[in-house]
Structure formats: structure tokens, C-alpha cells
């Protein structure tokens, strides 16, 4: 019995049992905590889930010397569509995620980040 429980435990934690909560993206209400979306496997370190992809902009806006990290989540291997002279058309359940932060010490990035704010842009049903 103990071996069965251990195997089940390993199976659960080695699969995508803990993945992005796509249903919450489409929900009418917003959750109490950002972590309920499960975009990050480690919220405090901003370590994204494997299906949350980092991206960078070619040209960024100045934001009071803060740094930004950006990620995109597109559900179920769906794809965004490109429309010339317009914005990308993301499928329902997609999310753009942006976190503002300052380094704890500019001279030593290994000391971590002071997280300031995380913003979400959620693609809901039309």
C-alpha cells in the first residue's frame, strides 16, 4: 500500500496535474489571488509554468527605471493569428502577463528581485 501511495504521489507530481487554470481565465469573476491562475510554479521567484512562454518587446516604454518580465499563455496548443497592420488575435483563454520589478541590488543580480506589480490581459469569450 505504501509503495502504491508513493508511486501515485510521484505520478501526480511528474505530470501536468498542476497546470495553468484555463477555466479561471474564462470565468466571469476574478480570483482573490493571482496564484490561483497557476501561471507560475514558483510565484515568489516568478518561475513560469512550462506552458507560459517568456517574450520581449523590440521597443519598450520607460517605467520609472523598473524592469519588466513578460509572458504569454495560449491554451491547448492553439495559435495566435497575425493580421497585417493590426494586433495579434489570440484564442479564447489566452493571457498576456507582465511583472514590474526592481533588482534588490543592481550590482548583484543574484540577490533577486523586488516584485512590484503583475498585470494580466485575459482573452475572454466575445
How does the language model describe each region?
Residues 10, 63, 109-111:
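Sterically constrained small-residue positions within well-ordered secondary structures
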Amino acid at each position: 500500500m505504501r509503495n502504491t501511495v508513493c508511486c501515485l504521489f510521484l505520478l501526480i507530481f511528474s505530470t501536468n496535474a498542476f497546470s495553468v487554470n484555463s477555466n479561471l481565465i474564462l470565468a466571469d469573476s476574478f480570483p482573490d489571488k493571482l496564484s490561483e491562475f497557476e501561471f507560475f510554479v514558483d510565484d515568489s521567484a516568478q518561475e513560469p509554468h512550462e506552458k507560459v512562454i517568456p517574450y520581449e518587446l523590440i521597443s519598450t516604454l520607460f517605467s520609472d527605471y523598473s524592469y519588466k518580465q513578460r509572458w504569454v499563455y495560449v491554451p491547448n496548443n492553439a495559435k495566435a493569428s497575425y493580421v497585417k497592420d493590426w494586433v495579434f488575435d489570440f484564442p479564447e483563454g489566452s493571457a498576456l502577463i507582465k511583472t514590474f520589478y526592481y533588482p534588490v541590488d543592481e550590482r548583484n543580480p543574484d540577490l533577486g528581485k523586488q516584485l512590484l506589480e503583475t498585470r494580466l490581459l485575459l482573452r475572454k469569450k466575445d
